[in-house]
Regions:
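Metallocofactor- and cofactor-centric catalytic cores in central/energy metabolism, strongly enriched
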Residues: 1-29, 232-242
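Flexible, charged surface loops at secondary-structure boundaries
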Residues: 9-17, 30, 59-62, 85-86, ...
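Structural motif
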Residues: 22-25, 69-72, 94-97, 132-137, ...
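Short, charged/polar "capping" segments at the starts of alpha-helices
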Residues: 26-30, 75-77, 98-105, 139-141, ...
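A glycine-rich, Thr/Ser-enriched phosphate-binding loop motif common to dinucleotide/cofactor-binding enzymes
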Residues: 34-52
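Glycine-rich phosphate/diphosphate-binding loop of Rossmann-like nucleotide-binding domains
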Residues: 56-122
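Rossmann-like adenosine-cofactor binding region
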Residues: 115-179
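Adenosine-phosphate binding glycine-rich loop
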Residues: 154-242
Length: 242
């Protein structure tokens, strides 16, 4: 009720609470800036998600190209691009902020790293097999001529591509396995709150990517499967992608 909501808001303000993990029906009453979202974990597991996919497909990253859709120069996004650029044959950054990202590329990437910058709606994603979509919404994505069998990993927003021509995969979330000791630690909260949210309540998201990834590894967190707009994506779906 309204009284409980006001009490919650006052408590958050009084104690200067920075992160809130709560069940879905309460989320609408909490400031999104401090609300832990079930998708938050995905930006720390991009490499692991790609490793999961490549293992199923029997492919090697160093033989493939990676594409990034990005407009915001958030540190966590740039750290991910830098990490992944070392794993793939070429790195392709698709952005509407070309001049900004030209400076970023010059500052943070080694000379031997092959980076391509583009915003060509017709050609940029025509051959893209693996796309990490940091902050593009569906309206922006639909402006591009996208490879019909592309695999998209959507970080900020859930994306459902309605085009009948698209036969690829759009990944919107990750289903994680957490160890028994953490399940015991969370107790009855596991019944009402998404486990991704509960786990991320233990993580300091202000830290750099490497430290958070170390924490996830130490906590023995593993990917069970990936989730698309129709639910769990089967391994067979990944195997059929050329």
């Amino acid at each position: 009720n309204r009284r409980c909501v006001e009490k919650l808001r006052k408590l958050i303000k009084k104690d200067n609470i920075k992160q809130v993990a709560c069940e879905e029906e309460i989320q609408q009453y909490v400031d999104k800036k401090i609300l832990i979202d079930e998708k938050d974990i995905i930006k720390y597991l991009i490499l692991e998600i790609l490793e999961y996919i490549f293992e199923i497909q029997g492919k090697k990253m160093e033989q493939e190209d990676i594409y990034f859709l990005i407009n915001k120069d958030e540190d966590i996004y740039l750290e991910n691009i830098k990490t992944l650029s070392e794993k793939f044959k070429t790195t392709n950054i698709i952005t509407e902020e070309l001049s900004k990202f030209q400076k970023i590329v010059e500052n943070i990437f080694e000379e031997e790293t092959t980076i391509y910058l583009s915003n060509n709606k017709r050609k940029s994603l025509r051959r893209a097999k693996y796309i990490v979509n940091f902050d593009y919404g569906i309206g922006e994505i639909e402006k591009y001529n996208i490879n019909r069998t592309a695999i998209l990993i959507n970080i900020e927003q859930k994306v459902k591509i309605e085009s009948m021509a698209f036969e690829g995969i759009s990944i919107n979330n990750v289903n994680i396995q957490i160890p028994d000791e953490l399940i015991e630690h969370f107790g009855r909260m596991m019944e009402k709150i998404n486990k991704n949210i509960l786990y991320m309540s233990l993580v300091n998201q202000k830290q750099e990517l490497a430290r958070i990834k170390d924490r996830i590894k130490e906590d023995n967190i593993h990917i069970l499967n990936l989730i698309g707009d129709k639910g769990i994506i089967s391994q067979e779906e990944f195997k059929r992608i050329p």
